[in-house]
């Protein structure tokens, strides 16, 4: 299996369609606005594990929802001019994807971060060798740049638009 590291930057909220790391996002003990689904969402190893695009159903796919490394702030690398991904600190915040950083379910529970960087590694199954591998984003708000193994593979501009990038070697 080939290990892939994806780094993506989005301005505003980022939603992505993986398996869960052994680390956890910081989840509050008490929620400000709990819903009937809050407890169920917290118990899920992979949040929203169902195939997100029924019109394009696939028998083989990898859900990347779960825990990602997160960096947010106002003074981070700009997605438009970024040619390489940022270096994440050794001790980094964790975010539960697909929830936006403003959501308590994300583990971040704050707004105001204008530049958001997400990072995680995953392995492409050996059975996919020789096939096209697409990275599908369910919704990204504003501007995003996506890096795979340190190489910029694409950018996208739009308001909560879905988009795909071909990351085939």
Model-inferred region functions:
Residues 64-115, 167:
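Core domains of carbohydrate- and sulfate-ester-processing enzymes
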Residues 21, 25, 45-50, 103-107, ...:
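N-terminal accessory segment at the very beginning of proteins
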Residues 1-9:
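Bacterial N-terminal signal peptides that target proteins for export
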Residues 8-19:
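Bacterial N-terminal signal peptides
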Residues 2-3, 19, 91:
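Generic short amphipathic/hydrophobic targeting helices enriched at N-termini
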Residues 23-62:
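N-terminal pre-domain segments of enzymes
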Residues 69-73, 107-169:
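Accessory beta-strand-rich segments of carbohydrate-active enzymes
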